[in-house]
Each structure stands twice: as C-alpha cells, then as structure tokens.
Amino acid sequence: MIWRDDAIASQPAGQHFRNSHLSSFSEYLRAQAPELLPALGKASADVIGNLPHGTTIVALTYRGGVLIAGDRRATQGNYIANRDIDKVQITDNYSATGIAGTAAIAVEFARLYAVELEHYEKLEGVQLTFNGKANRLSALVRGNLAAAMQGLVAVPLLVGYDLDDPNGETAGRIVSFDVAGGWHVESDGYQAVGSGSVFAKSSIKKLYRPGGDALTALAVAVEALYDAADDDSATGGPDLVRRVFPTAIRIDSGGAVRVPEADIERIAREVIAKRTEAAREEADLRESGGDS
C-alpha cells in the first residue's frame, strides 16, 4: 500500500478524524481515499497469473495458547518468486494472522488489519473482543470479493488468545474464512489454508493431540509443512543449504511472540533426520527382499 501525502488532503489537516466517528479504519479509508485500499481496480488474467502467490499456513491450539506457522515460498506460475517470504504476522498483543494467496494482497491485508485493530483501540480506549477481531477481518475479506472474483484471492487464518475465556487452558482460538468473508471458529483444534493445506491437514490429523504443550504444537506444525512441501510444489520445505525455515508465532496469556528461528531449525533438522532414516530403512528392506 502506497500512502500519498495528498491522498486525503482535500480537507484541513485533522478535519477528517474530527468529522468521522468511524472506529473502523478501513471504512474511514473507503470513505476518504478508497484508492488506497488493497486490490482496487481491474487486472487482466495475464497480470494475475504472473503475480507471486504464497502458501501454506497451518494453525494449532495447545494447552494455554495457539500457534500459527507458514512456509517461506512464493510462486509465480511455475517459477519460485521468493524463497524467504514471511507469511505470518502479529496483528496486536493477542492475535496474529497468516494469509495464503496473492502475496501482495496478503501482505496488505495483514498490514491494514493491524492498523484497523490499533485504530479501534485508540478511538475506543479498549481492545476489541476476539469475536470483534474476527468480524473486522471478515469485513476486509468481504471488501476484497470483487478482486477475488478476478483471481486476486487472499484467504486468511486468524489466531488469538481469548481474554474473555474463564478457562485459560482452552483460550486459544483459530478462525478460518471463505473468500466472501464468512468465518468459522475451528473446534478441532487445527486448520490449514493454501495450496498445500490438504496435505498439511492430513499430517496434522495424524500427529495432533489436544492438550499438548507449545513445543509439541511447533513440532507438529513443522512436520505438517514438511509433508505439504513433499506433495505440493508451491509449498517450500526447510532449506538446510540456505538455512531457510518456516516462521511461527505463538500466543498465550503473556501475549503474541515470534518463535525463535533456532527452535524451528532444530525441529526441522530432527524431522529431516527422522524421514531420512525411515527412507534408508525402507530402501534396505526393499534391497534385502530383492536378494531373497
């Protein structure tokens, strides 16, 4: 999103906010400078096909919190456009998003959503409830529907810690959205979006255990992204040569924090070592069977 000094300068400085009682920054922007919103206008099929796309995002709840993680690859048709894009973003003290789809739209969604939450808190003096945060992100997704119909699709996952839940151990929340802005709180404790989501969810389904700790959730997320990359060319797996690994954010009663890269690298190396050993044993078994 490019902010221009003259974009909302048709009135005296400061007059816009004094004249507006909108607690939604996106609605204020839509009224004052709609050209600054993501994905306005029309794009040709050729342009859309050549835009970088990012996948895959996974999210899991654990005892006392929630974790979201994403791979690092963005593709442009059959090319790898970027190997180290960060697809998960902290949006306020107790929420984070991961957005799969057209990379530029996804990045702008995350930035605009973070401003939306901050804008509300400054005007109202309180943070939105978690359901309120989901509704605000839903409105942004719905506002992108026209662009989505042209192929500029961005599908988010919202995760957060619900401060209104009296039971802190089950306060982790995952919300999925459709392209029309409909949202759903996931009751299974996990979800994935993006082109590799089918493979990632299949992996999580076998590995996920409700009530696990944050470290276990991180291990499941990394392995799920590894499985997604194994079958989906648009998803990037851990790259030991370039030292590029998934990124992750965890949220608990203490707030949202990025998982240190060293922790993710260690788990990724353990997953690769385990898979390498399993493949070696399978090859040895086939070889011994062939000799007999």
Curated annotation (Swiss-Prot):
Name of the molecule in the record: Proteasome subunit beta
Q: What is its EC number?
A: 3.4.25.1
Indicate the family of this protein: Belongs to the peptidase T1B family.
Pfam families, sorted: Proteasome (PF00227)
Quote the gene name from the UniProt entry. Answer: prcB
Q: Its pathway?
A: Protein degradation; proteasomal Pup-dependent pathway
HAMAP family in UniProt: Proteasome_B_B (MF_02113_B)
User: Would I find Cytoplasm among this entry's keywords?
Assistant: yes
What's its job? Component of the proteasome core, a large protease complex with broad specificity involved in protein degradation.
User: From the UniProt record, which GO molecular function terms apply?
Assistant: threonine-type endopeptidase activity
Active site at 55 (nucleophile)
> Which residues of the precursor form the propeptide?
1-54
Residues annotated as signal peptide: none
What is the annotated quaternary arrangement, including any partners? The 20S proteasome core is composed of 14 alpha and 14 beta subunits that assemble into four stacked heptameric rings, resulting in a barrel-shaped structure. The two inner rings, each composed of seven catalytic beta subunits, are sandwiched by two outer rings, each composed of seven alpha subunits. The catalytic chamber with the active sites is on the inside of the barrel. Has a gated structure, the ends of the cylinder being occluded by the N-termini of the alpha-subunits. Is capped by the proteasome-associated ATPase, ARC.
**Enzymatic class:** hydrolase
